[in-house]
């Protein structure tokens, strides 16, 4: 099992916030290798940066299984994927999280990532576009942050 950080645009987060019955039940992407780049049990932490530059951690998802297309995934979840432009989906293990809002910039600057490449001091959403594998120390720090904010 591996752990990763993934970035969503603030528009994607707002779409989730405004979707009736939304929970982080699945994760979609247009990446060609999306079905094979992860495996059952992988843990994904999601963050976003808003227009004012505030970086927030907003969800985490433990991957359960690759479900395929939007048409194959939508019957399995309690909300519509009609406005979501992705071609492939992973389902998350239950219970599914709702959104949380945890300040993340200070901690993000300390993350080593498996690559050993830290974020630059003045990072923005462009620096977070690539899905990054986390170290076990990174995961521990993120979990401690989540615990401090939401228990």
Describe each model-derived feature in a short phrase:
Residues 56-67:
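Short beta-strand-centered aromatic/proline hotspots
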Residues 27, 32-33, 70-151:
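Contiguous surface segments at macromolecular interaction interfaces
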Residues 48-54:
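Short, charged beta-turn/beta-strand-edge "cap" motif at the junction between a beta-strand
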Residues 37-39, 54-57:
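Short glycine/proline-enriched turns and hinge-like loops at secondary-structure junctions
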Residues 1-40:
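Short N-terminal edge-element motif at the start of the domain
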């Amino acid at each position: 099992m591996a752990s990763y950080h993934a970035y969503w645009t603030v528009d994607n987060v707002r779409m989730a916030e405004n979707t009736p019955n939304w929970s982080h039940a699945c994760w979609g992407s247009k990446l060609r290798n999306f079905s094979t780049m992860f495996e059952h049990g992988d843990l994904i932490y999601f963050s976003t940066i808003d227009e004012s530059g505030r970086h927030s951690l907003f969800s985490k998802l433990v991957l359960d299984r690759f479900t395929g297309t939007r048409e194959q995934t939508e019957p399995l979840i309690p909300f519509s994927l009609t406005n979501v432009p992705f071609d492939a989906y992973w389902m998350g293990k239950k219970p599914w999280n709702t959104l949380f809002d945890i300040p993340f910039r200070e901690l993000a600057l300390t993350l080593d990532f498996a690559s050993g490449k830290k974020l630059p001091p003045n990072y923005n959403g462009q620096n977070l576009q690539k899905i990054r594998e986390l170290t076990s120390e990174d995961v521990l720090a993120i979990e401690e942050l989540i615990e401090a904010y939401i228990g």
